[in-house]
């Protein structure tokens, strides 16, 4: 499913291709690209839930906004988000790429993925997808994009 999301993000969303694609055509394109129907369905459902945030149909968990409070992760969250992922989320909060609400949206979308393996690079892409879909997060999205591509470009040298 995550591969389908990555393909969609890179092919349709991130490249600013026509976003209003017929769902049947999209499903056919994904099938032609070699993706499994169940993965396609799950990825589209995942994106629908993400779009609910954008449209105001879903709200992230309401949290105390005390700056001295600290997020305690559940065992399920710790299982999916290792220490490096949790540290990266904290880092993004500290540099104000994420706020309390967007952090919770990211965690919720990560837990909704049906993938056995999940690492820091995957988390970065989920964060990018969430920020791209939330109105008012354009600057945060741009910062996250710079962080993601700057680090990856440095690895190529």
From Swiss-Prot:
Annotated InterPro entries: Smg
Pfam families linked to this entry: DUF494
Family: Belongs to the Smg family.
Name of the protein described by the UniProt record: Protein Smg
Organism of provenance: Shigella dysenteriae serotype 1 (strain Sd197)
Gene, per the UniProt record: smg
